[in-house]
Amino acid sequence: MYLHATGISPDVEKLAPYWEEESRVLAELHAEGVVKSLFRLNDRPVVYLILEADDVEDARKQVGRLPFVRKGLLRFEFEPVEKLI
């Protein structure tokens, strides 16, 4: 199933020490086909992911591999979506 995930970071100043590992894990998730697309808003600390997972819990588990998420620095809300094309 496909999901749209909205991630918000309440304290972006705390992200810096984890950027390298975050980038590595994101690349892994993309290579595994979990993260299909990643977008960032330019004016706010918000990211959007398009994911493919078995269900919402699987998506949470996969996104939970990200250091920002593990450290509580980025929180996601997940919504199942239907692929039209």
Each model region followed by its residue ranges:
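Conserved, structured core segments of small domains
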Residues: 1-85
